[in-house]
Amino acid sequence: MDKMKIIMEKGTERLKRGFAKMVKGGVIMDVTNAEQARIAEEAGAVAVMALHKVPADIRKAGGVARMAPVEKIQEIMDAVTIPVMAKVRIGHEAEARILEALGVDMIDESEVLTPADPFFHIYKKKFTVPFVCGARNLGEAVRRIWEGAAMIRTKGEAGTGNIIEAVRHVRLVNENIRLIQRMTDEEIYGVAEKFAEPYLRLAFSVKEISGLPKRVLENEPIYEGFTYREIVDGLYKILLEIKKLGRLPVVNFAAGGVATPADAALMMAMGMDGVFVGSGIFKSSNPPAMARAIVEAVNHWDEPDVLAEISREIGEPMRGQDIAELEVRMEERGV
């Protein structure tokens, strides 16, 4: 890669991360039409996520969940002045190109939609629009950041109104970061090698089909022209940055199962930079009141008296689901 290209890429990444920082400390709400988008904006959302169905309805409908119709996204973009995000299927570069051309402010490469690629996520550095991606653990987060994600969010278990998986993912990432901070650089390089292993799946599958040993050559490209060693080196640099910062080097939001002001406050108390709310707003009995309350909870997460007050007269939250009852675990999608 020539020097000018490296400089341009770093500049683009800085701009992408800068946009993500603009929504830090706020609430991003899933919406399916212009009316919902306006409710979200009036409640104080920092951005909206345009979908054809909220995650609870996607889960109920089954079948293949895809990018929202262009007309629906445009309708939402025309209705509000705050940033509009939209989801694409994991690995579906064509959907992402369409959204980039449409002018959305950020793309969510999301496990809520049916994955398109069983081996890889999109190489997000090829795009000028910033991406947000989900992560259950530090390995997933570091891989997505290396690929170019400007924002990370927990996966949680979308559409359930159950916060347990989001809590699990926050704890796993935070504890792994504390472990990294106690490790030597040599030990961290070993972690980078482990975190890079999912990129080998396609190469190993092809070699197994061909009756060859499951190993790759030093100069053998395995993902977007990168060799295994180049990927390891890239992940290693991010891990060293995490060791220095004591946190992810990008904005980190909670998502998946946030259904009440208390849920939102819990996520902020655990160190999150903000909150995505999917089904929790428009599957509640009083969406405008719930939306306002969750925004206030994020702003006042460390003030119990305020939280108690804003939790009054907000109606019933969405009906939740026990994780053990789920037929589909969306959080397990992706690598």
From Swiss-Prot:
Residues binding D-ribose 5-phosphate: 30, 159, 257, 278-279
Active site annotation, chain numbering: 87
Catalytic activity: aldehydo-D-ribose 5-phosphate + D-glyceraldehyde 3-phosphate + L-glutamine = pyridoxal 5'-phosphate + L-glutamate + phosphate + 3 H2O + H(+)
UniProt-recorded Gene Ontology molecular function terms: pyridoxal 5'-phosphate synthase (glutamine hydrolysing) activity
Binding partners and assembly: In the presence of PdxT, forms a dodecamer of heterodimers.
Family: Belongs to the PdxS/SNZ family.
Protein name: Pyridoxal 5'-phosphate synthase subunit PdxS
Lineage: Archaea, Methanobacteriati, Methanobacteriota, Thermococci, Thermococcales
Record gene name: pdxS
